[in-house]
Design a protein with these regions (language model features):
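Extracellular, repeat-based ectodomains that mediate carbohydrate processing or recognition
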Residues: 1-428
Length: 428
């Protein structure tokens, strides 16, 4: 890792969360569809990742198994990280979909985790109340969390939607918190929305907010701002193959085959101003009432923000950021050398930061687009080498403190098998 190639931002402060499992073929720490692997709340920062908790010098890969969910916290701005290792759950599947997701409910201070899914039974755990609200007095041990559950509190068990889960996602919803999942397979699935109510500590099934019809939505992001929950997504059309309707079929898990990203099309947008129950298009027209059993379907009017045909290199689950004005803009930033996905984030002053990886030279670069210039120009303000994976960002800290915290994987200059999960802090 080298931090001094291009330097218009100050040198970042780099802290280590833990060892990355370099022996795995797939990257598990740092994927674009992790909505929040790093979050700030009430002056503390939290991060989640997988690690084997063993030495990177071990020659036998079997000694580095299994992996464990790890959760770190620190008091901002610069206290030491404190770590919980959830060693009661063994992660053994080498599949890049099976990441860790985290959410914090503002109203009751609970922390929620969901992990290790690619069309699998739900895996979920949560903390006791108040652990994030009063971190100074809350002990940081695994026994303040539940064991791994296959349901969420408040939803009758067994629940038909929790048997085929991918892409869990948590996010703030005012005083409450939302939880969304995909139910189905690549090209053939729906997105479902649950609401965790702080007042009761229970979840409510709000409904199927995105319904696929011979396709499935891939969500770029879900962001809550000024009473509105914003969502963007692409669709992926489904291509039938032998055995697609077999309940035991696993071909769709192999990250190859006919239902890949070549079938992605269109960038779509909708929002809800009543906490996820009623959805409107960009023209403020109601298109789905979840309380009445409705869903946003591909044929709903006014969904398409940008019309992009199949086969144009449109990648699923890219990035989304909602600025204070909530206006669409479109500007080219030049070609990118690979399909690795980046991140978008808005600063305290409304400027846009683009964090872009380049695996062709193991670099990470940061571009800045000024709000004052209507985001028309993107200027590179930092570049470093020795990074891999897809960067993640603590969006809340940037917007509230003008500190850009980037979650990334740093690769040793001497050995590609020596990788660390790190946080880079830039004072912008």
């Amino acid at each position: 890792m080298s931090l001094n190639e291009v330097h218009r931002l100050q040198t970042p402060v780099v802290t280590v969360l833990g060892q990355d499992p370099a022996h795995r073929k797939c990257v598990l720490n740092g994927n674009a569809f992790q909505q929040d692997a790093i979050i700030s709340f009430k002056g503390w920062q939290y991060a989640v990742f997988y690690s084997s908790c063993s030495s990177s010098s071990l020659n036998d890969d079997t000694q580095r198994e299994p992996l464990f969910v790890c959760m770190n916290r620190r008091k901002l701005p610069n206290s030491e990280w404190q770590t919980i290792v959830f060693d009661d759950y063994h992660q053994t599947t080498d599949d890049g979909h099976n990441t860790v997701q985290m959410g914090i409910c503002p109203g009751d201070g609970t922390i929620h985790l969901s992990y290790d899914h690619h069309c699998d039974t739900l895996r979920y755990r949560r903390s006791i109340k108040g652990i994030a609200s009063d971190p100074e007095i809350s002990r940081w041990t695994k026994d303040v969390f539940t064991l791994t559950l296959d349901y969420v509190p408040g939803i009758t068990k067994p629940h038909e939607n929790f048997g085929y889960v991918t892409y869990p996602r948590f996010g703030v919803l005012g005083n409450d918190m939302y939880f969304s999942i995909r139910n189905g397979k690549a090209g053939l699935g729906d997105d479902l929305l649950y609401i965790h109510h702080a007042a009761t500590g229970l979840y409510e099934y709000a409904g199927k907010h995105l319904k696929g019809i011979q396709n499935n939505p891939y969500v770029h992001g879900m962001d809550y701002r000024d009473g509105k929950l914003h969502i963007t997504w692409v669709y992926r059309g489904f291509v039938h193959y032998d055995g697609w309707d077999d309940p035991l079929d696993t071909k769709h898990k192999q990250q190859a085959g006919p239902n890949g990203a070549d079938n992605n099309y269109n960038i779509c947008y909708a929002y809800s101003d009543d906490g996820g129950y009623t959805w409107k298009n960009g023209h403020d027209k109601t298109i789905a009432l979840l309380r009445d059993g409705g869903s946003i379907t591909p044929d709903c009017p006014g969904l398409v923000a940008f019309d992009i045909p199949k086969g144009r290199g449109l990648t699923n689950q890219e990035a989304q950021a909602v600025d204070q004005d909530g206006q669409w803009t479109q500007h080219a930033i030049g070609p990118v050398p690979s399909p690795r996905r980046g991140r978008l984030a808005i600063s305290k002053t409304g400027d846009l930061f683009l964090i872009l990886p380049d695996p062709t030279n193991s670099s990470l670069r940061i571009l800045k687009s000024s709000k004052a210039k209507d985001y028309a120009e993107s200027v590179e303000v930092w570049r470093g080498v020795g990074f891999m994976g897809e960067p993640l960002v603590d969006s809340k800290r940037l917007e509230e403190e003008d500190v850009l915290s980037i979650f990334a994987i740093a690769v040793s200059a001497t050995s590609s098998k020596d990788r660390q999960v790190v946080v880079l802090d830039f004072h912008i």
